[in-house]
């Protein structure tokens, strides 16, 4: 009996020791704890996730780090996921990036390149047969926006409208949040909106399904230059992993397979290294327009 009591006590002590030791979290970049790379839903979500998954696999093949891709439900969702530690890498549009940097310390590593440039413009589009020929004609019309966190599909066009004497909060009969640039173009094409804001030239993204879109939908006005969107990392992301992923992405962008995936995601032609200061001029433009990033980040 004494022997059994000793064995039982030993077993209990061992069990308590095991339960008392917290399990070590799986290492980041493993199947059990993958690196999450999140994309904003600025275009066709199915195409974005298809291209994103290809890019994630290529990163894994080059670095050995397990990377999983997803698409946010909206623009803000990606930013907030990074702030909550639920996403580690964000392909953030410009406005979303400067807000995420201010609010959560998210830091840019790469800027996208299109048409040989690291900047782009937004535009306001209308149907060719709408009779709208100048910005003033938009008063009393239905306006289509992408998302309140979209740089070229909301923020910058609103600044342009205000500079031309149009109050985007009061002068439209109705406003619609379409959710993506593709949806804005389609809504204007179908006559669901009289005008829409999007990047230049978002019409190309829907040309496969709407081959006459550039005849039916025309550009009314173009915004000032905007710095391109980013590949950004969370504040505490390990530097060694970040360096590996950045180098892998630069190699991917230089390969034929990688270029095809980048085109699928956001019509990206290349990637370049960037620092946060690249976006200072954009911040200055926002401040001039009365948009205070520090206040928005509170």
Language model features: what each stretch is:
Residues 83, 101, 116-119, 136-137, ...:
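Extracellular/periplasmic catalytic domains that process cell-envelope and extracellular macromolecules
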Residues 94-104, 162-163, 187-190, 194-215:
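A ligand-binding cleft/hinge motif common to bilobed small-molecule-binding domains
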Residues 30-60, 226, 232-233, 237-298:
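An extracytoplasmic/periplasmic, membrane-proximal ligand-sensing/linker region
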């Amino acid at each position: 009996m004494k022997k059994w009591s000793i064995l039982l006590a030993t077993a209990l002590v061992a069990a308590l020791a095991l339960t008392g030791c917290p399990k070590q979290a799986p290492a980041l970049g493993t199947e059990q704890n993958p690196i999450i790379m999140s994309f904003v839903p600025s275009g066709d979500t199915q195409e974005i996730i298809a291209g994103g998954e290809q890019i994630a696999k290529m990163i894994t093949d080059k670095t050995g780090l397990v990377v999983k891709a997803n698409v946010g439900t909206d623009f803000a969702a990606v930013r907030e996921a990074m702030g909550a530690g639920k996403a580690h890498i964000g392909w953030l549009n410009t406005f979303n990036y400067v807000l995420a940097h201010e609010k959560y310390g998210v830091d840019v590593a790469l800027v996208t390149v299109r048409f040989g440039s690291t900047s782009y413009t937004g535009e306001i589009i209308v149907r060719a047969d709408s009779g709208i020929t100048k910005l003033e004609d938009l008063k009393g019309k239905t306006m289509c926006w992408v998302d309140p966190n979209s740089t070229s599909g909301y923020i910058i066009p609103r600044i342009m409208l205000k500079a031309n004497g149009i109050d985007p909060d009061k002068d439209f009969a109705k406003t619609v949040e379409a959710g993506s640039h593709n949806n804005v173009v389609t809504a204007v094409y179908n006559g669901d909106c009289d005008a829409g804001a999007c990047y230049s030239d978002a019409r190309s993204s829907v040309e496969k399904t709407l081959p006459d879109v550039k005849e039916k939908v025309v550009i009314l006005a173009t915004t000032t230059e905007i710095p391109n969107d980013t590949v950004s990392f969370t504040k505490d992301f390990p530097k060694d992993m970040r360096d590996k992923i950045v180098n892998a992405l630069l190699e991917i962008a230089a390969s034929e397979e990688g270029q095809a995936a980048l085109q699928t995601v956001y019509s990206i032609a290349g990637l370049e290294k960037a620092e946060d200061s690249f976006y200072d001029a954009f911040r200055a433009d926002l401040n001039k327009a009365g948009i205070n990033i520090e206040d928005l980040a509170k």
